[in-house]
Amino acid sequence: MTEEKPAKKIGLLALIALVISSSIGSGVFGLTSDLASASAPGPVLIAWVIVGFGILMLALSLNNLLMKEPELEGIFSYAEKGFGPFAGFISGWGYWLSAWLGNVTFATILMSALGYFFPIFKSRQNLPSILVASVLSWSLTYFVNRGVEGAAAINTLVTICKLIPLFVFIIFGIVLFKGHLFTQAFWNNMSSSFVAGDVMSQIKNCMMVMMWVFVGIEGASMLSARAEKKSDAGKATILGLVSLLAIYILASVLPYGYLTQDQLASIKQPAMLYIFEQMVGTWGGYFIGVGLIISILGAWLSWTMLPAETMLLMAKQNLLPAYFGRVNKKKAPTFALVVTAGLIQVFLFTLLFTTKAYNFAYSLCTASIIVCYMLVAAYQIKYSWAHLQEKGNRQQLLIGVLALLFEIAGILMAGVSYLLLCFIAYIPGIYFYGRARKNNGHQHFLSKGEWLITTIIVIGAIIGIWLVVSGKIVI
């Protein structure tokens, strides 16, 4: 028998690229228009400070746990270690759900970008768009199935390529910036004075899209088992966050100094493409368009890797049946990749009948991943409290509390209704979790406590279905 070669390890640069690439997808290119629809520049800046601080607390929590618990693999492992296997399943299944729903958003906005070059794709939700998106989805699945580490190496190159249009846009934004235009309605009223109630409402309205663009910051943690050094995953999370925050603030705020808020809010999506076209002429639209396409393909590549890796790790830890962890000669989780791609395909075909596919998919994506983030913060609190006498753990306890409070506020602002819809997708997952328990010698399909939580999830799912049927949630 031939001895298997050990899997190649991913270095720090590739891990940082994974964090940046998995977060910079479609969101940053439409960020200005989405924010201008919700807020003036003053509240936007305050919201960035709040979201940046909250995400930093999450990143520091991840970094601390990676250092303190180096044997754990994957973001859901913290929930399992701190609160039991069912919590680990809830976290892992939610992360997997978030990842492939994110791929659906990439498909819809990619078709919009292609529509700038080829009018047949402009509607984003016609049959040609869905067919092309389907081919891309299965092609990326095939590529990742050829080897996860190989995909990560190419991801480093893709990240460099897609940052160039963003940096060029930021440079022109600085050069063409008009201070008087930026400050004339800084707080979104005629006197441009600070009015607390109005400002707080604007901050709340733009929090959702800001949290969406940070989805993926934990990417290095998910592949920490394959890092050359365990510490690299934590460093990549922090460095990736700092880079992302700088890019997002500049890309979203500078256009307020070039066009009025009303003009920005009414501009077509992808907003950055059309803003840059106004700045420099027709070539600007093509330049940003190519960058957007590369950006989405890079993020889509990352999020093809991550959900499959999640299923693989969950199967290894007996949270899913063993067949979810089957790998090929390249060490890629083939079964998990095919299952995930199949679900994406089903969702893509539903785009023929939905009206707000992009918003619906990214709202579900954000709501489901916030659950994972909450459990990370909760375990950070539990671990720090249990080791309170060790150096630095009082500060880590505070970091965990702040991260948890931020995520709770996030789920409330993201919309509890979308979380209830996510519960629908948990029901088949709970079946697989129960089968894994039985396969590993447990007498009962679920424990009493797990049945109680399952009942709550089912009730929540029924409420979610009612919200859709009654028209309170538009899909």
Swiss-Prot record:
Main location: membrane
Compartments it resides in: Cell membrane
Keyword Membrane listed: yes
Molecular functions per Gene Ontology: arginine:ornithine antiporter activity
InterPro entries tied to this protein: AA/rel_permease1, Amino_acid_antiprt, APC_superfamily, Arg/Orn_antiprt_ArcD
Membrane topology: Multi-pass membrane protein
NCBIfam families found in the cross-reference section: 2A0302, arg_ornith_anti
Protein name: Arginine/ornithine antiporter
Species this protein is from: Latilactobacillus sakei
Upper lineage: Bacteria, Bacillati, Bacillota, Bacilli, Lactobacillales
